[in-house]
From Swiss-Prot:
One of its GO terms (molecular function) is cyclic-di-GMP binding. It is found in: Bacterial flagellum basal body. This is Cyclic di-GMP binding protein VCA0042. GO terms for cellular component: bacterial-type flagellum basal body. Residues 12-24 have a biased composition (Polar residues). Belongs to the YcgR family. Residues 134-233 form the PilZ domain. Keywords: Bacterial flagellum, c-di-GMP, Nucleotide-binding. Residues 1-11 have a biased composition (Basic and acidic residues). It comes from Vibrio cholerae serotype O1 (strain ATCC 39315 / El Tor Inaba N16961). Residues 1-24 are annotated as: Disordered. May act as a flagellar brake, regulating swimming and swarming in a bis-(3'-5') cyclic diguanylic acid (c-di-GMP)-dependent manner. Increasing levels of c-di-GMP lead to decreased motility (Potential). Binds bis-(3'-5') cyclic diguanylic acid (c-di-GMP) with a dissociation constant of 170 nM in the presence of 10 mM KCl and with 100 nM in its absence. Binds 1 to 2 c-di-GMP per subunit. Only 1 c-di-GMP is seen in the wild-type crystal, while 2 are seen in the mutant. Depending on the concentration of K(+) stoichiometries of 1:1, 1.43:1 and 2:1 are determined by isothermal titration calorimetry. Its main location: other.
């Protein structure tokens, strides 16, 4: 596995940021793709032979015989689809893996085939290697805790999916309010199974987002208050063999 100093890279919303890890590693594509969750969003950056650039997002389906990467056809206009999605065109692809320490996976791929029936999908080439940038200094612990997300005067449902001392990942219902990168939010996580009490809020700013059919998924980077409250929350959770849970769940 090769490593080199990290470069500035685009985050999931097209803004430039530097990964917190100091290296970008080159690993084989089989191991890299195993880090990408099915149905997660891929960002495709296409450059036509005449130099016109186009960026869109589309869900990742999976792989076929280790030769092709299968993706849904993006929801863009028919004109853009016809002009930018032509067999033989090259594109840069970016995926975010939320597992463990988190990673940004990026590689170059060629559009090989387009299938229209029975469902539209694109077949993309799989390179031998891919670049992986670690996003976090520390691992995040998987959990599944309900709560509320607060933004300005809005208060909506959320679910905390993983947590570390410096950040977390949470999801919201697909029809709920959409938050943008840079928004300052607070998560009030329920401290009892009935949802009548909450832990001190996890506060910080949205640093990335992904959307799917079932929910919107956000990465949150804590501020100082959020880091202190996250440390307190982690101290009150217990590991049940697969994920962190409330102490109350152990007794229920």
């Amino acid at each position: 596995m090769n490593s080199r100093p990290a470069e500035k890279i685009d985050n999931n919303d097209g803004q430039t940021e530097t990964p917190r890890s100091k290296t970008v590693s080159t690993i084989n594509s089989t191991d890299a793709l195993a880090m990408v969750e099915h149905s997660s969003e891929l960002t495709l950056s296409i450059t036509t032979p005449v130099g016109t650039k186009f960026v869109c997002r589309t869900p990742f389906i999976g792989t076929h015989t280790d030769k092709f990467l299968l993706v849904e056809m993006p929801k863009i206009s028919a004109d853009d689809l016809q002009y930018f999605f032509q067999e033989g065109f090259w594109m840069n692809i970016r995926a975010i893996s939320p597992r463990g320490e988190g990673a940004l996976i990026h590689f170059r791929s060629q559009l090989m085939h387009i299938l229209q029936e029975p469902v539209p999908m694109a077949f993309l080439s799989i390179p031998n290697t891919m670049q992986v940038s670690q996003l976090r200094k520390e691992p995040r612990f998987e959990l599944n805790l309900a709560g509320k997300v607060l933004f300005d005067e809005h208060r909506g449902d959320c679910e905390l999916r993983d947590l570390s001392r410096s950040g977390c990942r949470f999801i919201t219902p697909p029809l709920g309010k959409t938050y943008q990168v840079g928004d300052l939010v607070a998560l009030e996580i329920f401290s009892d199974l009935r949802g009548t009490k909450t832990f001190p809020p996890l506060t910080g700013k949205i640093c990335n987002l992904q959307r799917s059919l079932h929910h919107a998924r956000y990465g949150l980077e804590f501020n100082e208050e959020g880091r202190n409250n996250a440390k307190n929350l982690l101290a009150q959770l217990k590991f049940n063999g697969t994920k962190l849970t409330l102490n109350a769940e152990k007794k229920a």
